[in-house]
Amino acid sequence: MKNLVLSFLIIFSINCFSQDTITTAKVNEYMDKEVCVIGKVVSMKLASEGKSTNYINIDKPYPESVFTVVISNRYLETLNLKLEDLMGKIIYTKGKITIYKNDPKQIPQIFNPISIVVKKE
């Protein structure tokens, strides 16, 4: 059973890395495509009471953000991770690159990513 779980994790990791794994500097080139973005979590805004959206800024903090991971509280439960534990870590985020239509800064984002994996040190 342990080998089966280990095999699954390896296959999942290979799947993320075998796709286009890009840095935040290249996200604009992959608009509306599903990719795996690598970068360091430098700041975040967690949903306050009455709010339901969390923002994780990768490589540069807000307001100089170059890429943001946006996760709703409901969806966060399916990812099974604590956002606070990601601060300062390098992560792989898999999902579709989009831009929120009402964002005046037009910052690329992944909304409710398929997966977030912390890079092993």
Stretches found by the model and what they are:
Residues 1-20:
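Bacterial Sec-dependent N-terminal signal peptides
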